[in-house]
Amino acid sequence: MNYEGKTKIVKVTGDYALLEFKDDITAGDGLKHDVLTGKGSICAETTAILMKYLSEKGIKTHLVEYIPPRTLKVIPLKMFPLEVVVRLKKAGSFVRRYGGAEGEDLPVPLVEFFIKDDERHDPMVCVDHLEILGIATKKQAEKMKEAAVKITLALKEFFERANFELWDIKYEFGLDKDGNVVLGDEISPDTFRLRKKGEIFDKDVYRRDLGDPLKKYREVLELCRSLNSQ
């Protein structure tokens, strides 16, 4: 069984699945779209490094192994049709909804749930919505929330070693064959905001037409390689 999304192709092969990263980059619910040669391999390796780091911290991910240049061998998950966002600072849609200045600290990590639905612009929902709509139970939602905060704080610590600031990050979770909530999808500049002294190292470079996003993605990969080897 194969499935192709905006930025990845999933191929289920027996007990495992292959997650192939494409060179596509999108923004605005897919309305903005380009192909950047080499992006897929950058995001695949970045994800592999960061998920391996999380596994060493005792956090469950779907990663089994990285198959260069652009493929991850993963545990198949029954994915929740959700994006789970953790915010450490005000940015993006949070500022549009609630105001404030980009980069302002939030007093505690803020967790938000969004239904994956481009046509409805990924509506934000609360835990009660998830249960009423049959998307996830309250217990599953709490497990996702707990894991998302734990992962975010671990990644924040990882990047702080090089004086980079993790502003916010988006996750996707699923259930393994035993019903455990497990981190799936990817962790890359496609899914987080990463800054250093005002410089942007994430997809906002593409969203805002601020230069060459591929250059910044490469720099993040080099950063992850360097920190991983320490």
From Swiss-Prot:
Organism lineage: Bacteria, Thermotogati, Thermotogota, Thermotogae, Thermotogales
EC category name: ligase
Signal peptide: none
Family of this protein: Belongs to the SAICAR synthetase family.
HAMAP family (UniProt xref): SAICAR_synth
Keyword Nucleotide-binding: yes
Protein name per Swiss-Prot or TrEMBL: Phosphoribosylaminoimidazole-succinocarboxamide synthase
Domain of life: Bacteria
Coiled coil feature spans: none
Pathway: Purine metabolism; IMP biosynthesis via de novo pathway; 5-amino-1-(5-phospho-D-ribosyl)imidazole-4-carboxamide from 5-amino-1-(5-phospho-D-ribosyl)imidazole-4-carboxylate: step 1/2
Pfam families reported in the protein's UniProt record: SAICAR_synt
Gene from which this protein is expressed: purC
EC number assigned by the record: 6.3.2.6
Keyword tags: ATP-binding, Ligase, Nucleotide-binding, Purine biosynthesis
Catalysis performed (reactions): 5-amino-1-(5-phospho-D-ribosyl)imidazole-4-carboxylate + L-aspartate + ATP = (2S)-2-[5-amino-1-(5-phospho-beta-D-ribosyl)imidazole-4-carboxamido]succinate + ADP + phosphate + 2 H(+)
Biological process annotations from GO: 'de novo' IMP biosynthetic process; cobalamin biosynthetic process
Gene Ontology molecular function, alphabetical: ATP binding; phosphoribosylaminoimidazolesuccinocarboxamide synthase activity
